[in-house]
Amino acid sequence: MTWRHHVRLLFTVSLALQIINLGNSYQREKHNGGREEVTKVATQKHRQSPLNWTSSHFGEVTGSAEGWGPEEPLPYSRAFGEGASARPRCCRNGGTCVLGSFCVCPAHFTGRYCEHDQRRSECGALEHGAWTLRACHLCRCIFGALHCLPLQTPDRCDPKDFLASHAHGPSAGGAPSLLLLLPCALLHRLLRPDAPAHPRSLVPSVLQRERRPCGRPGLGHRL
């Protein structure tokens, strides 16, 4: 073999080695780039998932800025005027829902769900929570509406008669006064200058004094 063949062989081998080296470098760069891209995508998804969950659930909890009203009107107790709703919702008449439970009501509206218009009042000069007697019914003003109890005085509509019907009788207040009468009489007898030395002797005399008719002239004290 001549020297030309040796030179050609060396050139071919060196060219092949360079091609192999370039191919390996390209494969390494491609592999590293793919791993970095996968890592970036995973990091972005991990960062976005809590944000999306928080925003979506926050929207479900707080509701819209304009509020959302109940599907059915709230029933009210005619006796006490308290609303009873199986599915509480926010808010009526343009109220703003806060934290899913409270309503910020616009002007002239009040109530838990902004359902009462203060401009439409059945109470006249009565304030919220005040009681009144209306057509023999005891009524209470609740958010501008009168809520009345069942008829309590079918024969008489005087408020004094209504209060007297709930009393226990005329002798209910007399028992405490009778119980206090005997100690007061004993104390009065003890403070007298001519009281006897033994307190036991006071009891018959006090009892006799209490049995004596009061206010009749000509009767004196017997000690």
From Swiss-Prot:
PROSITE patterns noted in UniProt: EGF_1, EGF_3
Keywords per UniProt: Cell membrane, Developmental protein, Disease variant, Disulfide bond, EGF-like domain, Gastrulation, Glycoprotein, GPI-anchor, Heterotaxy, Lipoprotein, Membrane, Secreted, Signal
Main location: membrane
PTM section of the record: N-glycosylated.
Cystine crosslinks: 90-97, 91-103, 105-114
Subcellular location: Cell membrane; Secreted
Top-level taxon in the UniProt lineage: Eukaryota
Family: Belongs to the EGF-CFC (Cripto-1/FRL1/Cryptic) family.
Role this protein plays: NODAL coreceptor involved in the correct establishment of the left-right axis. May play a role in mesoderm and/or neural patterning during gastrulation.
Protein name: Cryptic protein
Lineage, top ranks: Eukaryota, Metazoa, Chordata, Craniata, Vertebrata
